Each structure stands twice: as structure tokens, then as C-alpha cells.
């Protein structure tokens, strides 16, 4: 779900891609571009993550371009120096382009619409009267968060073009009202990549479900690479395949617990240098969360290892000098994956720095972009499982 409150947009630029897939397989590649503007807020990111997961009341104890038909590229934006990643999706006939936040931590596709009484003036709005493939549904939807942000409206169906592959009759949620945090944000809605058991309206199929059932991709997978602003930004989503040029070494297969509708994994151990700072804990891979949000005890141990001080709001103040930091390393299913020292600092303000990790009073971790921009992930909805490898720098 959307956790970043941002208020300006930039132009979207196309990037070249390289995709791995078996011959004849269908896939979509969605690269990402960078926006250098916007001042991030770690506190906002923490609060929005808390709101997102509280509403579900969780209780836990060698590549190259493959010349296939069906390959499509949609530019995306790394907004606010790794605060949020969103991409352009075309909806309706004739098609209208919408900037959507791609989010593995939720499962709804919702957009601003002309039915909306308070949507942002700069948001692109879907108009049912202007699409010949619009189908009325009539059911209502509503999403509310613990921080007071919300969106609500009605369901409809229309064609959705995702990177050049046309999903027919995709259920979309048309916003009739939305909170200011959405209205003033950089995007026009959200595209959820979680499992369909957590759609706001039960029984609705996700875009990934329909890509599979309509035969638009040959494998039920998507690869995610999120670029770092410090390295020029960029990144890509690839549906039906993955890009082996974006990671180094081999992919490690990790089982997924999707019983709650999320991409749940187990982290076996966390270390800093030679010191183990945490033993086994559960986590959710969530591209829609900016930071690495840890269980309170794990966050406290990590903070001690880096000499960070608790700000009392889920964030930590940390040294701005990352040259003396060692990476934070997660051991997952027998392999090691790093959060690099530069990712341990999220924002700097008046000579003080806020850490790229925090806590939210959960007994599980929300493994957001702080981790994911350091590691390539292939999400496999069919098994389910993920495959992870360190990004190629």
C-alpha cells in the first residue's frame, strides 16, 4: 500500500532492458527512471507502514534482450530519492495513462476517477464515459488506514495495458473520495502485486492473476529491480521473466508463506560484521514500503550495532558517516544478503541523519525498499516462492 506522502511529479523516461526467459515465453519488462526532487520523511514512512499492516490485524509467531512477441516496456519513476517507485499503466479504450505505485504488500488496483469529489488536481482521472470497454460493476470498496488516510469508491471493469500486454476485463477500483495524502501524492493510484486473498472486495482477481489466466505470460513470475538514487536511480519490473544482468551470482530459492496474502519469508539471522544481532524472525517482502521496519527487539539490536539513538517515533538518528559502517547482513535459506552501508542512512537534515531502518511494534519485519534496492527478487506466484540474489553494482 502507499506509504509515502509526496506532492510533485516528474517526466518519465524510457530505459533499455534485458530479459531472461526460456524461448517462446511471454513477459513484460517495466523499467524505472529516477526523480531527483523531494525531501524524504522516515517518520511518515514508519507511520504509513504501521497503518497498512494494523488494518489487517496480523498475528504471527548472463542475460540479453529476448526477441519475443509480448515484451513491453513501461518507464517508471524512482520518486524522492528511493522514497517510492511508480510506473505508467494504460487503462481503457482509447487508452489513458496512469502513474501507479507498484506494491507487493497489497492486492488492489485503484485509480483516481472523474467521479471523485476531492481527488488531486494534478492526478490523471479515469472517466467511465470516455472508455468504450468500460463495464459497470456497482459494488463499493473502501480502504482505511490507522493514520486517517483512506480511499473509497465503486468497482468497474476495463482493459488494462501493462507493458504492452492487454489484460481484458480487469477489475479496477474507481476512487470517489481519497485522503489528502493520496490527492497530493505523485501517483494516480496503486497496482497491488500481493495475493488475491487480501483484495478489498473478496473474489476480485489481481492483474497478476489475469496475466496468468489469460495466457499473457508463460510463467507466473515477475522480477523486481529497484535502482538506487545514488547510482542514478532506475530499475524495472519484468512480468513472466527476470533480468540476469541486474544481479550477481546465482538466485537463492526461498519458500513463501502466503497464508496472510503477503510474500512472507523467514530471516534466519541478522549480523553486523562478526556479531549476530538477531536470530530467526519472520518478514514480508513489500515494495510499497520505503524502509526496513524490524521487530522492536531486532531494531534495537541493530541500532546498538551502529550506535544509533531511538527517536521514540519508530525512527533512529544515525551517524551520517557511512564509511565506517559494515553492511547489515540477512541470512535467508542458507545464503547471505546485504543492506549496504549507504542504505543505512535514509535522510539527512541539518547535519543529522535518520536511519533506513526502524520499528513499528510488530513481531515481524516489513522488508521494504531499504533491503530490496540491494537485492534482486523474482516473485513466483505459482509455487509460491521467491528467488533472491544481490544486485549487480
UniProtKB/Swiss-Prot annotation:
Enzyme Commission number(s) of this protein: 3.4.23.21
InterPro entries the UniProt entry points to: Aspartic_peptidase_A1, Aspartic_peptidase_AS, Aspergillopepsin-like_cat_dom, PEPTIDASE_A1, Peptidase_aspartic_dom_sf
Primary enzyme class: hydrolase
CDD domains, per the entry: Aspergillopepsin_like
Domain Peptidase A1, chain residue ranges per copy: 85-389
GO biological process, one term: proteolysis
Gene3D superfamilies named among the record's database cross-references: Acid Proteases
Catalyzed chemical reaction(s): Hydrolysis of proteins with broad specificity similar to that of pepsin A, preferring hydrophobic residues at P1 and P1'. Clots milk and activates trypsinogen. Does not cleave 4-Gln-|-His-5, but does cleave 10-His-|-Leu-11 and 12-Val-|-Glu-13 in B chain of insulin
SUPFAM superfamilies for this protein: Acid proteases
Propeptide positions: 22-68
Disulfide feature: 116-119, 320-353
Signal peptide: 1-21
Coiled coil: none
Keywords for this protein: Aspartyl protease, Disulfide bond, Hydrolase, Protease, Signal, Zymogen
GO molecular function terms attached to this record: aspartic-type endopeptidase activity
Active site per UniProt: 103, 286
Similarity remark: Belongs to the peptidase A1 family.
Name of the protein in question: Rhizopuspepsin
Native source organism of the sequence: Rhizopus chinensis (Bread mold)
Taxon lineage: Eukaryota, Fungi, Fungi incertae sedis, Mucoromycota, Mucoromycotina
Amino acid at each position: 500500500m502507499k506509504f509515502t506522502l509526496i506532492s510533485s511529479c516528474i517526466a518519465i523516461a524510457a530505459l533499455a532492458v534485458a530479459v531472461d526467459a526460456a524461448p517462446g515465453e511471454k513477459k513484460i519488462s517495466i523499467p524505472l527512471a529516477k526523480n531527483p526532487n523531494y525531501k524524504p520523511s522516515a517518520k511518515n514512512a514508519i507511520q504509513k507502514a504501521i497503518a497498512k499492516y494494523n488494518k489487517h490485524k496480523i498475528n504471527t509467531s548472463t542475460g540479453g534482450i529476448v526477441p519475443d512477441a509480448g515484451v513491453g516496456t513501461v518507464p517508471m519513476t524512482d520518486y524522492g530519492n528511493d522514497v517510492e517507485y511508480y510506473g505508467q499503466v494504460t487503462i481503457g479504450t482509447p487508452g489513458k495513462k496512469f502513474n501507479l505505485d507498484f506494491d507487493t504488500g497489497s492486492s488492489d488496483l485503484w485509480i483516481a476517477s472523474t467521479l471523485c469529489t476531492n481527488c488531486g488536481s494534478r492526478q490523471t482521472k479515469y472517466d467511465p464515459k470516455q472508455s468504450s470497454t468500460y463495464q459497470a460493476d456497482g459494488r463499493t470498496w473502501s480502504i482505511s488506514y490507522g493514520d486517517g488516510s483512506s480511499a473509497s469508491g465503486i468497482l468497474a471493469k476495463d482493459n488494462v495495458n501493462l507493458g504492452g500486454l492487454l489484460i481484458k476485463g480487469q477489475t479496477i477500483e474507481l476512487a470517489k473520495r481519497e485522503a489528502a495524502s493520496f490527492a497530493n501524492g505523485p501517483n494516480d493510484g496503486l497496482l497491488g502485486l500481493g495475493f488475491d486473498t487480501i483484495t478489498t472486495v473478496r473474489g476480485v482477481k489481481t492483474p497478476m492473476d489475469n496475466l496468468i489466466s489469460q495466457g499473457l505470460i508463460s510463467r507466473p513470475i515477475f522480477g523486481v529491480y529497484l535502482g538506487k538514487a545514488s547510482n542514478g536511480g532506475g530499475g524495472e519490473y519484468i512480468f513472466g521473466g527476470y533480468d540476469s544482468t541486474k544481479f550477481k551470482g546465482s538466485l537463492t530459492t526461498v519458500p513463501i508463506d502466503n497464508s496472510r496474502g503477503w510474500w512472507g519469508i523467514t530471516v534466519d539471522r541478522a549480523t553486523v560484521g562478526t556479531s549476530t544481532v538477531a536470530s530467526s524472525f519472520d518478514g514480508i517482502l513489500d515494495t510499497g514500503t520505503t524502509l526496513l521496519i524490524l521487530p522492536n527487539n531486532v531494531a534495537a539490536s541493530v541500532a546498538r550495532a551502529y550506535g544509533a539513538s531511538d527517536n521514540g517515533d519508530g525512527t533512529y538518528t544515525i551517524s551520517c558517516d557511512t564509511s565506517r559502517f559494515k553492511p547489515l547482513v540477512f541470512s535467508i535459506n542458507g545464503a547471505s544478503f546485504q543492506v549496504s552501508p549507504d542504505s543505512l542512512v535514509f535522510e539527512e537534515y541539518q547535519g543529522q541523519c535518520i536511519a533506513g531502518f526502524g520499528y513499528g511494534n510488530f513481531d515481524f519485519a516489513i522488508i521494504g525498499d531499504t533491503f530490496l534496492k540491494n537485492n534482486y527478487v523474482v516473485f513466483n506466484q505459482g509455487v509460491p516462492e521467491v528467488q533472491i540474489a544481490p544486485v549487480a553494482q
